Amino acid sequence: MATPHDPDTAPAAAGETDAFSDRPVVVVGGGPAGLTAAHRLARAGDPVVVVEQDTVLGGISRTVERDGWRFDIGGHRFFTKVVPVEEFWHEILPPEDFLLRPRMSRIFYGGKYYDYPIKLGNALGNLGVLEAIRCGLSFLWVRVRPPKDQSTLEGYIVSNYGWRLYRHFFKTYNEKVWGVSASELSADWGAQRIKGMSLWTAVWEPLRSSLGRRRDRRSQVTSLIEEFQYPKYGPGMMWERCAEQVADLGGEVRMATTATRVHVEGGKAVAVTVAREGSSERIACSHVISSMPLTALARVVDPPVPVEVSAAADDLHYRDFLTVALVVPAERGFPDNWIYIHAPDVEVGRIQNFGSWSPYLVKDGRTCLGMEYFVFEGDELWTMSDEDLVALGTKELAHIGLVDPGDVEAGYVVRMPKAYPVYDDTYRDNVEIIRRWFEEHAPNVHPVGRNGMHKYNNQDHSMYTAMLTVENIQGAHHDIWSVNVEEEYHETSDARTGPGATTSGTGRDAPVLPRRAG
């Protein structure tokens, strides 16, 4: 099977040259994957129609604006080892729209702040010599007696850090994120998100830097990057500009429009029915590129998919997400992009300082702190009123010691459903059942992106699946399901900067251009 590194560029099948191929490609979803695919198609002169059910572009990579404040939902560092993605970013936005930002994250645990990734000196100082020795011995012990079951997230992390560090720095946070024990989750999530990380890596990397031995970016573990690019008005400006370019290139982008049916006839998708403001339209198509949740895609197929496929779709699960954004004086901010909250006595999982991402997201003299809560749609937190959520966020921010309650000037709530696909013990089989059905019965339906493939991809990996999918439509045979799975791809892909990558400054001292009104 061909991989992203070994494309088969055989010409398209003869059937693709008939009138059917003159129909547009319908792209479902206006997030990074969908808009990247649409841009690639439009640039090649192919007809394309994007349908996005929301009124805001970018999916989870959007920038939300309220009263002139801008929020990056989930936080999106623009760092990649994938050259075409890097080049695409700079094709969409000019150099002056990027800032170069310092990467800084910490863990709040036991009333103390720990550097993340874990640094030896800081951890020793906070844990104390005796507990640090215990953690070291615990790590050595798992080298001799590794966990019997490393197929779970718990087993995967313990095998890399030891039991004591797992309990200190991973257990509580992961249970907040997923709402279940890490022993009930697949190791796949850890393999994607912390691949290449271990206690040894965390100790050796700072020593390497202190000795002046900087790693080439092509071998750098992504979790250890020291700086990253960032659009000055947040990630949403990338996707708003991308959609504008799609339209300029002859494509069509429809907002507040929902795909309600994907019609399959004769072994392929032939049309997509969309709905907007009470009316519907059937759009004939040559291909469907879908970044809608894989569960939703299976449910809109007409005629319906078999019971086995429907059951697999129903058994895929998601974790939802909400941000409580609190406006506070600038001096109440912190230098981190975010702080992971491992304290079990508060429900917040992570706190962003939007001013540390970009001064253009906040207003002079004040900053905005994003309290991030991991929830299930319909649970107590999700259904809580905005006023009560702002009160909860204020209370927990004060409990942690970052602000006094009276410092909070205003608060806003943003809810994001289906933010994280859950890697439980059945997800892989369920995805394979759905994937196999589409490959056999509607091969011109192409799932892409995080929710489209039910894969916890980063933004760049989601974009790359879209790029490879467009190449497949044009005649190649890439295996897009290997993206962010193969070790070689994830760890050693070339990472030169690409054209136009010169940035306009670093850190909080990046040049501040006149802010737009509001």
Region annotations inferred by a language model:
Residues 63, 85-110, 164-168, 318-319, ...:
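A short alpha-helix-loop-beta-strand transition element characteristic
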Residues 20, 134-262, 270, 284:
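Active-site/ligand-binding neighborhood in enzyme catalytic cores
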Residues 20-50:
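N-terminal Rossmann-like FAD-binding beta1-loop-alpha1 element of flavoenzymes
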Residues 67-145:
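Dinucleotide-binding Rossmann-like beta1-alpha1 core, especially the glycine-rich loop
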Residues 2-22:
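A short, basic/flexible loop-to-alpha-helix module at the beginning of a structural domain
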Residues 42-65:
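Glycine-rich FAD pyrophosphate-binding loop
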Residues 6, 414-417, 425-518:
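C-terminal lid/capping helical subdomain adjacent to the catalytic/cofactor pocket in oxidative enzymes
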Residues 20-21, 44, 255-402, 406, ...:
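Mid-domain catalytic core of redox enzymes
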